[in-house]
């Protein structure tokens, strides 16, 4: 028996962006926010004009990494450190992977439907903002 899960919609992506913005605005941290669909395609993006320029790239790479590994980037960062089981993974693939906290997968009914990434704050801040945004779905 096959069940169909509603994919991540533009409305969902806008909800995630708005929730992340509320969290970052309350903390006074300017960030970039990326939402990807299950295929890794950009669904929504928002960069605070005060955020560091590279945050747009880091938020997208964090979201992509969380999507590909179906895990928060905060949980996999230690795996690629020297001596970790996947130490060579970031350089062994031609993919925009970034093993820094701030990327989280998005699930619906237990199925992976996309990912959210934040960049611009400290890694633990970005992770907290992403987790807070997920609560809005």
What are these regions (language model features)?
Residues 1-137:
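Flexible, solvent-exposed loop/hinge segments and secondary-structure transition points
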